[in-house]
């Protein structure tokens, strides 16, 4: 069974993607940024943009019945890798005890030049595996 959710972002139907998709026990969350009602917020603040992007991930997970502790992988796209301490601090505040696999990559640009950070995640809601 596949279930999809939208965040209501104006570009989702234009580009043709879902905010998150559940396929069985796996949830894939598309890249989340610091946007509110289609507007970039916390311009220039990498920590706050990361915090808001992660809240977007958490909100998408919740709509599909999952929580942050279900996250097994994050990918963090940043436009300035020298800001990694602030970005990492925000990520650690959410995932410090969960410690998913994670990659942070510098990219040339995101959809809007005011965006500094984009976070995508994969979550697993199945059994915990061998003890």
Regions from the PLM with identified roles:
Residues 1-131:
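Short, polar/acidic, helix-capping and beta-turn segments at strand->helix junctions
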């Amino acid at each position: 069974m596949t279930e999809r959710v939208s965040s209501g972002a104006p570009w989702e139907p234009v580009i043709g993607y879902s905010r998150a998709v559940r396929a069985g026990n796996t949830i894939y969350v598309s890249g989340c940024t610091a946007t509110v009602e289609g507007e970039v917020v916390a311009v220039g603040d990498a920590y706050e943009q990361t915090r808001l992007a992660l809240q977007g991930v958490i909100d998408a997970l919740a709509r599909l019945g999952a929580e942050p502790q279900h996250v097994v992988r994050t990918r963090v796209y940043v436009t300035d890798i020298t800001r990694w301490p602030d970005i990492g601090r925000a990520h650690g505040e959410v995932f410090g005890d969960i410690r998913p696999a994670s990659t942070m990559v510098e990219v040339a640009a995101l959809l809007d030049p005011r965006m500094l950070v984009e976070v995508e995640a994969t979550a697993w809601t199945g059994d915990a595996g061998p003890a």
